[in-house]
């Protein structure tokens, strides 16, 4: 390459940074931006550009990357998830829906490319990426918390009727993102590996405590249960590995005390628990319609019925909506549907045994 060539290192970092910015912003607002950001980051890591006037040369290392895919099962598993959904289109009659689901699964195809090349990305960039995500989540949480404080009575009553705290995206997805942020912050605090300034540690401790309080305020069961399971697994591995049995027992007691304290101190969580207990009593009376948790359980029952009817191949991802409608109508004489609220059952029902295998 002659002296007029420009090193790609000066270009790819800007695309990678763009991808990180889109991901951190889209995490709270748009799944499309999340998918697009992964594609951009993947492209920035596997494409090499050389500008040699008057030509622009583009090179890729896909052949080399293809060989690397076989060195780590996680890469193949992610690609397998995408391929299973893609292949199920062969027996799907509703092609538009199949295309939609396939497009949503594209990140599983590109993510391994990012993971293969992520080692070439400076560590501070990765740290900065997670900081961007957590900062974005923090700012949206401030808006949610401010709204809750202003309308706490109305929101608590709304939760008692099966509603949820208003969030910019699905409240279930949002709460899980909060739980993951808490676990990332905890890792930074415990390992003390990523701090460049002394005051950073105190910022992470503040955010850790703040998000723990916040996740109980928004009172979404998926996020709270996921958080407690994550905390239990993390500290179980960390403490038992170092043979600290007393501290492990203290950790269990701490989680128990935290849950009891949150129930008694956070009105929204108390309302959520009360509503959950009440709707199960209604279910015992044979009522299920318009009760959020019970509707999810019914959706799982309908999903299992679909699995029973299509145990090997599934319906095909494109036909899952129509088959679900037919199943609801046949079993419950009801036209409003929900997809099976369990990823294992949904994947099995839509893509058959291969779909079930792909997420194990």
Identify the residue ranges that each predicted region occupies.
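Membrane-interface micro-motifs in multi-pass membrane enzymes
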Residues: 28-36, 100-104, 165-181, 222, ...
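Hydrophobic cores of alpha-helical transmembrane segments in multi-pass inner/ER membrane proteins
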Residues: 40-44, 108-114, 175-188
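Aromatic-anchored transmembrane helix interface
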Residues: 75-81, 95-118, 127-137, 141, ...
